[in-house]
Amino acid sequence: MELADKASFRDAMAHVGAAVNIITTDGPAGRAGFTASAVCSVTDTPPTLLVCLNRSASVWPVFSEHHTLCVNTLAAGQEALSTLFGGKTAMDERFAAADWQTGATGCPRLEAALVSFDCRIDQRVSVGTHDILFCHVVAITRHPEPRGLMWFDRGYHTLMRPAC
């Protein structure tokens, strides 16, 4: 057993696989997006997700002003887009790299996402370095792509949907 310091916690979390998502928003403060794996279901009544966003992230000021977002869960083959949205690239360049539609909330919805959850942000809670956004899902768009994209052991991996 080891003490849970920052480094050991990060190393341990590398062993926990997660879907890769691009979180987007648009509104008075502008259009923004970032890559996130810290996204999960909270409840289905009402349908709610949580999204974690570091307050030191360049996109935080935009998301802090908006009340809607879209969680775009990536499919296999979208690693480059994930990397682009996870870096310091200008927003216009990030969004120019893929095809987007406007979702039910007005947020950018990735056309080729495995699934997109259009959300209204109902609550924000600050914990440590991050804000936790509780997001009420108002619309869902699914893509028939059978392969998901996962982040595990500090790398991308493809997950196949089982054949029926």
UniProtKB/Swiss-Prot annotation:
It comes from the Bacteria. GO terms for molecular function: FMN binding; FMN reductase (NADH) activity; FMN reductase [NAD(P)H] activity; riboflavin reductase (NADPH) activity. InterPro entries: Flavin_Rdtase-like_dom, NADH-dep_flavin_reductase, RutF, Split_barrel_FMN-bd. GO terms for biological process: nitrogen utilization; uracil catabolic process. Its EC number is 1.5.1.42. SMART domains: Flavin_Reduct. It catalyses: FMNH2 + NAD(+) = FMN + NADH + 2 H(+). The keyword Flavoprotein applies. The keyword Kinase does not apply. Keywords: Flavoprotein, FMN, NAD, Oxidoreductase. It is an enzyme of class 1 (oxidoreductase). Belongs to the non-flavoprotein flavin reductase family. RutF subfamily. Catalyzes the reduction of FMN to FMNH2 which is used to reduce pyrimidine by RutA via the Rut pathway. PANTHER family: FLAVIN REDUCTASE (PTHR30466), FMN REDUCTASE (NADH) RUTF (PTHR30466:SF1). This is FMN reductase (NADH) RutF. It comes from Klebsiella variicola (strain At-22). The lineage of its organism: Bacteria, Pseudomonadati, Pseudomonadota, Gammaproteobacteria, Enterobacterales.
